[in-house]
């Protein structure tokens, strides 16, 4: 990677991996539609390139968290249907209609605002009712769905295109809560039907639901983390072999030998036990490398694992290099990805940081440039 004139910390995203993941997920899906969820800047991978690659590979819809994220995709020429999965304020109704976005709807106030703007602009607002079947997050209770459905049916510029829910434990095989949520979802569908509302697109399955719960596929499945090649949870026998799309790299900035008894970084949490070879890397928690990985994680240099020593600082961190490894300034370092016969995954780092792989990749900050390979389908 040519980084002349740049700080040598970067991420590489393989768009062919994204395409392969989309095709693999579509092969096992029973639903006629697949939504690629690209919220949070495409889970840290880059929303526009990931969305483009996903659509090229056969994704039918895109999902985002906010109106602003949807507008960004539209500004880059993406014309596929986009559903805003998160909260939308009534004040955003004009942008929703102007950009042709679909929105999650769970209160009448937003419906009225969309109808007013739709009438003014001469456009229809398409909404997907969100049902809270057990996440306790946004959404209507199943018993409330019929009431709102009847209210929306009286509006002249709002179409109830879809109805959806979100599964809380789909990544836990055998957990009966998923079945309970689907039963509640079916009850909500019955409430809507009784109100004379029959949305064309029913959807409930996330990445884990897509891979483990075919009974949740309905008319569309949604996938985000699996699109970028990461398993929804560790320790599960997933039926699809996913291709991780992201590799995170830096370069050695300094190499030195420190005598026994030398402390490293803030708080002196690591002290050399003997004469040790220490490399300083130009990457830190401001780049998204979690401080919680201090004295826990490893990196790859010349295909060997090197432990992080001392506290990860804002812009730099230190690693201990094996005595027999001839490391030089400028050597490539892999933080996430493969090098030689070794691999460090986002899932591995998540386990060490007491979090999930989603947070690791979403946390890679915007000051880390992304470079894209496989840009031609």
Swiss-Prot record:
UniProt record, GO biological process: D-alanine biosynthetic process; peptidoglycan biosynthetic process
UniProt EC number: 5.1.1.1
Entry-linked PROSITE patterns: ALANINE_RACEMASE
Catalytic activity: L-alanine = D-alanine
InterPro entries named among the record's database cross-references: Ala_racemase, Ala_racemase/Decarboxylase_C, Ala_racemase_C, Ala_racemase_N, Ala_racemase_pyridoxalP-BS, PLP-binding_barrel
Active site: 39 (proton acceptor), 266 (proton acceptor)
Cofactors named for this entry: pyridoxal 5'-phosphate
GO cellular component: cytosol
Protein task: Catalyzes the interconversion of L-alanine and D-alanine. May also act on other amino acids.
PANTHER family named among the record's database cross-references: ALANINE RACEMASE (PTHR30511), ALANINE RACEMASE, CATABOLIC-RELATED (PTHR30511:SF0)
Protein name: Alanine racemase
């Amino acid at each position: 990677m040519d980084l002349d004139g740049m700080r040598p910390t970067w991420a590489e995203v393989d768009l062919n991996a994204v395409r392969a993941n989309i095709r693999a997920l579509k092969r096992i899906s029973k639903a006629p539609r697949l939504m690629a969820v690209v919220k949070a800047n495409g889970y840290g991978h880059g929303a526009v390139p990931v969305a483009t690659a996903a659509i090229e590979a056969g994704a039918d819809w895109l999902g985002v968290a906010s109106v602003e994220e949807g507008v960004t995709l539209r500004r880059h020429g993406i014309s596929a249907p986009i559903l805003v999965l998160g909260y939308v304020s009534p004040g955003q109704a004009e942008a929703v209609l102007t950009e042709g976005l679909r929105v999650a709807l769970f209160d009448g106030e937003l419906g009225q605002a969309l109808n007013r703007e739709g009438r003014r602009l001469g456009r229809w607002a398409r909404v997907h009712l969100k049902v809270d079947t057990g996440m306790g997050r946004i959404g209507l209770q199943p018993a409330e769905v019929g009431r709102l459905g009847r209210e929306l049916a009286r509006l002249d510029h709002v179409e109830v295109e879809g109805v959806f829910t979100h599964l809380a434990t789909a990544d836990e095989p055998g957990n009966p809560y998923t079945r309970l949520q689907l039963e509640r979802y079916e009850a909500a569908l019955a409430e809507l039907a009784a109100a004379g509302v029959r949305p064309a697109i029913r959807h409930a399955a996330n990445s884990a639901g897509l891979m483990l719960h075919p009974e949740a596929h309905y008319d569309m499945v949604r996938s985000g983390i699996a699109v970028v090649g990461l398993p929804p949870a560790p320790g599960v026998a997933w039926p699809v072999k996913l291709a991780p799309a992201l590799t995170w790299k830096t370069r050695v900035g300094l190499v030195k030998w420190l005598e026994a008894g030398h402390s490293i970084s803030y708080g002196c949490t690591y002290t050399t036990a003997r004469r040790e070879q220490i490399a300083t890397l130009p990457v830190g928690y401001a780049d998204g490398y979690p401080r919680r990985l201090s004295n826990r994680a490893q990196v790859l240099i010349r295909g060997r694992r090197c432990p992080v020593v001392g506290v990860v600082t804002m812009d730099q961190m230190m690693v201990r290099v094996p005595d027999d490894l001839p490391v030089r300034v400028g050597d490539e370092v892999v933080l996430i990805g493969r090098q030689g016969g070794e691999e460090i995954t986002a899932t591995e780092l998540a386990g060490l940081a007491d979090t999930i792989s989603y947070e690791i990749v979403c946390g890679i900050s915007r000051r880390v440039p992304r470079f894209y390979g496989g840009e031609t389908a």
